[in-house]
Amino acid sequence: MKKNIFLLFILILVTVGVFAEAETKFILITDFAYYPKSSPVAMGLPQDDVSRFAPLDGFYSAVEARVTGKMDYKIPTPFGTNPLVKGNNVTISPALEISPVTLMPQFFVAFTPIAFLKFTASAKIGTGWDFIGIKGMGDLDSAENGYKSLTPFKNYFYEFRLSNLFQFDVGAIVPGDWTHVVMQASYDILYTGLTGVENGTPWIWQASGEKANGWNYYSQIILGYQMPLVLQTVGLQFELSGYYDEASFDAKYLDWNPSFMRVNINPICILKFNENHSLTIQTRFSSRRGFSSDRGEDATNFNLNYNGREWWFERVALSYSYSF
């Protein structure tokens, strides 16, 4: 009995010691994006596989804005004094994202077992509404009529995600202020859904459509160079995303190509003004489904036949981060 009490006492001391070293940081992130207009270019026959580029044909298509408040609670979990493992930690991060058309609480748990690896599990749930013609949440009425709005706080978007991240910095093996060539590569498995919407039915969330209940993937690679300047980082980001199974969408949308993999190429730069303030600037060249004919008066592309990848300049985005 005394032995058990002693072991419990030691466990309490260790636990208190670990949490006493924990760090808490609050982060406020403000995102804004501007989208110029780039109309789809129809070409070829349904059986073709035609790559194309859609030029800009208008100054304005849309804007996007949101604010995210987040708390990071970092618990040190060092496995030793080796540089690879002495910085190990578990970070617990509740967050709240607010946009003009959505409200979405989020929760993240990240574990860094070694300096160059990070594993993250996260969950999100949110609801949306319409505002000045922007649709926060809805499901497809028909390809001709587009999406119809769902009831806020009755229908909910949800996402569960598992992510692994590999990161490497040349500066870790070649010390110096100007040797920080960095690379990050990640792969995420996620399930997204909208309550009250039947499986196979397309839906829209945060004014972005062509989604359905089902398993998705998201992967990114970032190659960058960090400097001891206000312009801290310049780099190039590659993003890949899509649905694992075309059966996530109803069979009648098969010609639309449900399993299309979207590819984004994003030049980025990060301005770090001090330890608390930073600004990320990103431009995005993206790809979307190309079709052999124009959708005409239809509100969506779901009645069209996919016949290749179409590239276009999608947006310019700003993300301002303040931490304290």
Question: Regions from the language model: what does each represent?
Answer:
Residues 25-54, 115-224, 257-259, 272, ...:
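Outer-membrane pore/translocation modules
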Residues 1-4:
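Positively charged n-region of N-terminal signal peptides that target proteins for export
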Residues 74-78, 85-87, 112-116, 171-173, ...:
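Outer-membrane beta-barrel channels and translocator barrels
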Residues 8-16:
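Bacterial N-terminal signal peptides
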Residues 59-66, 94-107, 113-116, 213, ...:
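Solvent-exposed loop/turn segments connecting transmembrane beta-strands
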Residues 21-41, 65, 88-96:
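Transmembrane beta-strand segments of Gram-negative outer membrane beta-barrel proteins
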Residues 72-74, 82-132:
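Outer membrane beta-barrel
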Residues 33-82:
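N-terminal ordered "arm"
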